[in-house]
Structures are given as C-alpha cells and as structure tokens.
C-alpha cells in the first residue's frame, strides 16, 4: 500500500471517530442518545434497515407460546430466558397460555391494541426514536406510537402517580459517567414483563443504558417484583442507530389490523 493511500485512510478513520464523538457527546460530557434505532439481532447489529413486513405485519397477533413454563434468568450471554414466576403468578401464566393455545388473545394487551408496557416496550421488534434534552429523554416506539419519558431533573413520583399506574410507568434517571441509569415504577399490572409473563403492581424496572460501540446502544434491564418473581430477572437488548433514509418511523394504526381495511 502506498504511503499516501495509507495516510488518507488513517485520516478518514480519524475524522470519522472525531465526527462520531461530536455527535454522541451531549451537554456536560454525557452521551446524546438522540436518533432512530432498530433492534440489533443476536450475533450482530442490523445496518439501519426497517423491520421486514413493516406496519401491516405488526398487526398480526403473536403465535401461541410453545414453552412448557417460564424458567431461568440471564444465563447465556445476551440471550434472555423467561422470568421465574411465583406459584401464584405461574398459575396466571397458565391461564394466559391456555387462552393463547385455544386461539384467544383475551389476556394479551398487544393483540388488543393496548400499549406494550415496560419493560416489554424495549424488546419490541420495531423501530424506536429517542429524543434527548437536558431535562428528559423521550422514547417513541413505532409500535402503536407508544412513548415513555425519563425525567432527568431530579423529580420523584408523587403518591398520586404511584396510585395511578400506567403501561409505560413513571421513569426517572441520572447519569453515572456515560451510562444512563433509569428507575421505573407505577407500572400497570395488566401488562406483561416479556411477551406473556404477568407481574404485580409492585414491579419495578431498573435500566443501565449506554453506547457499547459507535451507534450501538445497550439496555441492561433488571426487573424486581416480590409478588410475581422468585428473584430479579435480567435481560439485555441492543439497538443499532439508523441512517437516512431509514431514520423515519412509520405511523402505526393498530386498530386497522383488528377491523380490516375499509377498502
């Protein structure tokens, strides 16, 4: 390789690194997560392409679960397994499983166009846009335009908020170096932890969100629920930042999938 060519390549790499740093660093040395992301599949991150099937495929109800029961915790690197449920909530899960196996989705909030809830929202196979300002970070999910806000200004949930749980819950966060630490409470008990595991009104979610490489975001999630779980459940999700023209989320009209097209 010619010295001139090698120097040019090094300059390009260095400029790219500097450009990435200037984009990712926000405010007082904290990363800027702003952008549109898609889930990075196991073994690598998707290169910014929109999910196959798009909006119409997303209105199809998920297949019935085939596992015999929810078991295990984070035991194989980034491959999460299902939460360990207490006997009371294992019985609830059995009702959900039997309902799905019979072709009914009565107990499935997503199949009924309700929000996915937390932490399930962070594991959906759809795009997600993050908008970051000094005092808050807002997550917009492509699934049914669901959103959640993480407040960074030091506020705490009031008793009124705790008494009125929502699907996204109430999230507050702070920075520990380059990692955003988020605590979420006041979560609606009709949502699921994952795709089918129920939880109680006492569930809380802690996240540690950070860049693990340029444009690749990692969310390490710990779920605690003394009534529904025999021990805290951990899972990890990664997301790849999209580049134009794939950095635009599509409108998601979930109800159209339920009633059919008017035409």
Q: Could you say what each language-model-derived stretch is?
A:
Residues 2, 20-263:
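PEST-like low-complexity, intrinsically disordered acidic/proline/serine-rich tracts
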Residues 1-7:
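N-terminal secretory signal peptides that target proteins for export/translocation
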């Amino acid at each position: 390789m010619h010295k001139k060519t090698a120097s040019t390549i090094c300059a390009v790499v260095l400029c790219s690194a500097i450009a990435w740093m200037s984009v990712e660093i926000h405010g007082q040395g904290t990363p800027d997560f702003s952008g549109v992301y898609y889930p990075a599949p196991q073994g690598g991150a998707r290169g910014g392409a929109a999910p196959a099937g798009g909006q119409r495929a997303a209105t199809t109800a998920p297949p019935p679960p085939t596992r015999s029961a929810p078991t295990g915790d984070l035991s194989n690197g980034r491959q999460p397994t299902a939460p360990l449920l207490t006997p009371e909530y294992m019985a609830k899960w059995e009702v959900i499983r039997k309902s799905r196996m019979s072709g009914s989705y009565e107990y499935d909030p997503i199949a009924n166009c309700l929000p996915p809830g937390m932490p399930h929202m962070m594991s959906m196979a759809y795009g997600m846009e993050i908008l970051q300002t000094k005092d808050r970070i807002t997550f917009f999910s492509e699934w049914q335009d669901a959103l959640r806000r993480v407040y960074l200004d030091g506020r705490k949930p009031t008793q009124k908020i705790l008494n009125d749980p929502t699907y996204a819950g109430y999230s507050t966060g702070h920075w520990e170096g380059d990692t955003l630490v988020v605590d979420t409470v006041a979560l609606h008990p009709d949502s699921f932890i994952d795709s089918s595991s129920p939880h109680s009104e006492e569930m809380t979610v802690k996240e540690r969100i950070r860049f693990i490489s340029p444009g690749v975001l990692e969310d390490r999630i710990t779920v605690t629920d003394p009534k529904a779980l025999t021990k805290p459940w951990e899972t990890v999700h990664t997301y790849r930042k999209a580049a134009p023209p794939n950095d635009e989320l599509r409108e998601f009209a979930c109800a159209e999938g339920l009633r059919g097209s008017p035409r």
